[in-house]
């Protein structure tokens, strides 16, 4: 039998490249799972850390209501909000194409249940004026 003088690393590199390809493909599918919302631009935005305890309420451009990235009717959302603690943190993510009326409906639901700790998601407006 012939003795190996050194270890052949080419098969190891092949396996690593296949694993890298799998990770990259999987990561792209995970990022596509989020609801696409074109949030409005604002010049006075503040960077905030994502709060894991905050509830996420989203309105898409086709006026669909989402609670933590799951489609929900306005009636079910109203029931859900009524069950929250008054100090509950809420993040609103509203598409810029949505009629202002829908935004008011959502904030009215929160106000009716005395939810005051609300953050609105916007993009930083970088256009020079």
From Swiss-Prot:
GO cellular component, one term: plasma membrane
UniProt name for this protein: Biopolymer transport protein ExbD
Membrane topology: Single-pass type II membrane protein
Gene3D superfamilies membership: 3.30.420.270
Principal location class: membrane
Function field: Involved in the TonB-dependent energy-dependent transport of various receptor-bound substrates.
GO biological process terms held by the UniProt record: protein transport
Cytoplasmic side: 1-9
Record keywords, A-Z: Cell inner membrane, Cell membrane, Membrane, Protein transport, Transmembrane, Transmembrane helix, Transport
Subunit (UniProt): The accessory proteins ExbB and ExbD seem to form a complex with TonB.
Residue ranges annotated as Periplasmic topological domain: 31-129
Family indicated by similarity: Belongs to the ExbD/TolR family.
Top-level division of the source organism's lineage: Bacteria
Record's subcellular location: Cell inner membrane
GO molecular function, one term: transmembrane transporter activity
Residues that span the membrane, as ranges: 10-30
């Amino acid at each position: 039998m012939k003795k190996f003088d050194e270890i052949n690393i080419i098969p190891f590199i092949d396996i690593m490249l296949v694993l890298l390809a799998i990770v990259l493909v999987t990561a792209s599918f995970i990022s596509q799972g989020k609801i696409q919302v074109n949030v409005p631009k604002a010049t006075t935005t503040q960077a905030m850390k994502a709060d894991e305890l905050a509830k996420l309420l989203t309105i898409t451009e086709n006026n669909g209501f989402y609670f933590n990235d799951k489609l929900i009717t306005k009636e079910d959302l109203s029931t859900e909000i009524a069950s929250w603690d008054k100090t509950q943190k809420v993040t609103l993510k509203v598409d810029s194409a949505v009629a202002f009326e829908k935004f008011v409906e959502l904030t009215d639901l929160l106000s009716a249940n005395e939810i005051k700790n609300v953050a609105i998601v916007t993009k930083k407006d970088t256009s020079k004026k």
